[in-house]
């Protein structure tokens, strides 16, 4: 239900940033209150990312107030915090559709708005892209400014520091804003600090600073004394001198919820040349007590009533993440050499309990997927048994390390790959539909696809007991609901399981689509196989099936291009087995947001769609 804009007298007249710039500066605090209230009430009705957006209301307003967007380029890293930005840039009345099928994209998206200059979703990309845009802006000489807004988590990644290092050496005009919500605003982020931030960013100070550099350049001892004096002044109010060493003019930290001071400081900084760095302190969930107290819980929320706690999910089957977390605890009880690594995805990967029960075996490396994988390599070389818990979409970021540091050395590292397949509302940047394709071509890798919770547990155990690289990939969400046997069984590598005997048509299923495929196999009197292993394939079974079946179907929740079905095709061709194979999976395109079921229906990956594809391909089955 759309919100009544009569309750938002200022916001109702703000459709685009040019409308915002018509407000008097003194009106901005009241406008921020309205924007924050609108954001809270909208997300509570629709679900979505909440706490991050609440924390950057003043910063977003100040940036659009001072910078001439969309002429100036404004980039938000990751994009969880971009809801206020979307509201201010022509999408206010569509916010009820965010993250929904055919609705607004969950993150800034270039195809959606000219104000979204970079499509995002993964972290730490903003500074590198901003530098590229600043280089182009310098060449076009039209006075275009470039701003990157990045959080304290995202800036810890190596890619962000690589970009900072490069930007400082090029000296292009650009502003990096560090949104630091790691802690609440501390005492040193008060009136004095905000005042000093305005002084340090002001024209008079800047002119004196640049002029003194020229005057003192020929007097090295005096120049060094002046530099140390400036560093001491900044050091009194900020520990972040590292950014000065990168070549940035550092300002801050300052209160990220004082919109008046932010406007004054940003106005000063917009007129400066060279790389600028503004450090603002914000509180995630600002203005909504429950979110301030538990920003992780309120990071992404379902529909809820703001004056009540979040609704509890109804009892359901265990999620695959929970299955992994339970296995990890049980395995750690047995194996003192087990270690578990996550790149900042403890909650999502089901590792909260493990991090407490086995704190000495738990390693959160922050947003550093490349490091996570090479860390595991070092552990394996030294005799430990590492498990890397990682989302499919984020494993893409560590592909070189997987090959160079793990596979080439044939190290015993287990990859527990969560969110494999269609993940839903986060859209193209988060769908985990490429891992089978990029894993199965890597020598020494064992790749497993469980069809249910028990098989997942047994595969994790099997992979952990191997002395070579292994991957178990499982989807987001709940499993089949079967009762899980705590006893772990080691599977025979490369052996599939015939689930149902049939005639002529054989359906080879990789993963949890086995449930959908079963009803189809019943209707078509087809043989159904739980393939279990993408690499190595059960070649003996394939040979036997090829001698008794004329037609094949492969089903997987992965890109058809290069996926498990392609592995079957390649094997049949290598053996000169002439048979017909239909590959069913993710088509060769990026998949939009929507619920998992909506996407399955769209791609004809539900039972009805799978049957339709098979009958359409093998027309005699109609």
Curated annotation (Swiss-Prot):
Record Pfam families: DXP_synthase_N (PF13292), Transket_pyr (PF02779), Transketolase_C (PF02780)
Residue runs in coiled coils: none
EC number: 2.2.1.7
Signal sequence range: none
InterPro entries linked: Dxylulose-5-P_synthase, THDP-binding, Transketo_C/PFOR_II, Transketolase-like_Pyr-bd, Transketolase_BS, Transketolase_C, Transketolase_CS
SUPFAM superfamilies xref list: Thiamin diphosphate-binding fold (THDP-binding) (SSF52518), TK C-terminal domain-like (SSF52922)
Keywords for this protein: Isoprene biosynthesis, Magnesium, Metal-binding, Thiamine biosynthesis, Thiamine pyrophosphate, Transferase
Superkingdom as given in the UniProt entry: Bacteria
Pathway annotation: Metabolic intermediate biosynthesis; 1-deoxy-D-xylulose 5-phosphate biosynthesis; 1-deoxy-D-xylulose 5-phosphate from D-glyceraldehyde 3-phosphate and pyruvate: step 1/1
Cofactor needs: Mg(2+); thiamine diphosphate
Chain sites annotated for binding thiamine diphosphate: 80, 121-123, 153-154, 181, 288, 369
PROSITE patterns attached to this UniProt entry: TRANSKETOLASE_1, TRANSKETOLASE_2
Similarity annotation: Belongs to the transketolase family. DXPS subfamily.
Function: Catalyzes the acyloin condensation reaction between C atoms 2 and 3 of pyruvate and glyceraldehyde 3-phosphate to yield 1-deoxy-D-xylulose-5-phosphate (DXP).
Subunit structure: Homodimer.
Record-given protein name: 1-deoxy-D-xylulose-5-phosphate synthase
Organism name: Psychromonas ingrahamii (strain DSM 17664 / CCUG 51855 / 37)
Organism lineage: Bacteria, Pseudomonadati, Pseudomonadota, Gammaproteobacteria, Alteromonadales
């Amino acid at each position: 239900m759309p919100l009544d804009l009569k309750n938002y007298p200022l916001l109702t007249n703000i459709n685009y940033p040019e409308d915002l710039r018509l407000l008097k500066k003194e009106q901005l605090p009241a406008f921020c209150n309205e924007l924050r209230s609108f954001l809270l009430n909208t997300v509570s009705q629709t679900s979505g990312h909440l706490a991050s957006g609440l924390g950057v209301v003043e910063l977003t307003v100040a940036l659009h107030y001072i910078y001439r967007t969309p002429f100036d380029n404004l980039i938000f890293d990751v994009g969880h915090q971009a809801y206020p930005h979307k509201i201010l840039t022509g999408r206010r009345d569509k916010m009820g559709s965010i993250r929904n099928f055919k609705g607004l994209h969950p993150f800034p998206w270039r195809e959606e708005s000219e104000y979204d200059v970079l499509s995002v979703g993964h972290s730490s990309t903003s500074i590198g892209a901003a530098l590229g845009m600043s280089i182009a802006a310098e060449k076009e000489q039209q006075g275009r400014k470039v701003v990157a807004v990045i959080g304290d988590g995202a800036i810890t990644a190596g890619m962000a520091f690589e970009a900072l290092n490069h930007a400082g050496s090029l000296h292009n005009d650009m502003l990096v804003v560090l949104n630091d919500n790691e802690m609440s605003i501390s005492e040193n982020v008060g009136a004095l600090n905000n005042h000093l931030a305005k002084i340090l960013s002001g024209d008079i100070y800047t002119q004196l600073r640049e002029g003194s550099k020229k005057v003192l350049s020929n007097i090295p001892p005096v120049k060094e004394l002046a530099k140390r004096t400036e560093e001491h002044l900044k050091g009194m109010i900020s520990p972040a001198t590292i950014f000065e060493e990168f070549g940035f003019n550092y300002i801050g930290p300052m209160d990220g919820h004082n919109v008046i001071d932010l406007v004054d400081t940003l106005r000063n900084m917009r007129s400066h040349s060279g790389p600028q760095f503004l450090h603002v302190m914000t509180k995630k969930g600002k203005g909504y007590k429950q979110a301030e107290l538990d920003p992780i819980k309120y990071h992404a929320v379902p529909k809820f009533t703001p004056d009540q706690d979040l609704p509890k999910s109804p009892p359901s089957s265990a999620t695959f993440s929970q299955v992994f977390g339970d296995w990890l605890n049980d395995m750690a009880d047995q194996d003192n050499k087990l270690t578990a690594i996550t790149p900042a995805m403890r909650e999502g990967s089901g590792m909260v309990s493990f991090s407490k029960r086995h704190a000495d075996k738990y390693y959160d490396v922050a947003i550093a997927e490349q490091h996570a994988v090479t860390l595991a390599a070092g552990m394996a070389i030294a005799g430990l048994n590492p498990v890397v818990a990682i989302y499919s979409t984020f494993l893409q970021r560590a592909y070189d390390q997987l090959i160079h540091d793990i596979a080439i050395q044939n190290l015993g590292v287990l990859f527990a790959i969560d969110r494999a397949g269609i993940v839903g509302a986060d859209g193209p940047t988060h769908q985990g539909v490429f891992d089978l394709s990029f894993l199965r071509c890597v020598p020494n890798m064992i790749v497993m696809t469980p069809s249910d919770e028990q098989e997942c547990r047994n595969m994790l155990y099997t992979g952990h007991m191997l002395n070579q690289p292994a991957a178990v990939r499982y989807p987001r969400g709940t499993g089949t609901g079967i009762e899980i046997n705590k006893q772990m069984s080691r599977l025979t590598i490369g052996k599939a399981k015939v689930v149902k005997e049939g005639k002529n048509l054989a359906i080879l299923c990789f993963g949890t689509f086995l449930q959908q495929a079963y009803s189809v196999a019943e209707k078509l009197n087809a043989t159904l196989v739980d393939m279990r292993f993408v690499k190595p394939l059960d070649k003996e079974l394939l040979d036997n099936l090829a001698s008794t079946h004329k037609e094949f179907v492969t089903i997987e929740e992965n890109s058809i291009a290069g996926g498990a079905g392609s592995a079957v095709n390649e094997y049949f061709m290598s053996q000169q087995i002439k048979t017909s194979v239909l590959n069913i999976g993710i088509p060769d395109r990026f998949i939009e947001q929507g619920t998992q079921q909506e996407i399955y229906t769209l791609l004809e990956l539900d039972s009805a769609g799978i049957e339709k594809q098979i009958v359409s391909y093998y027309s005699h089955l109609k």
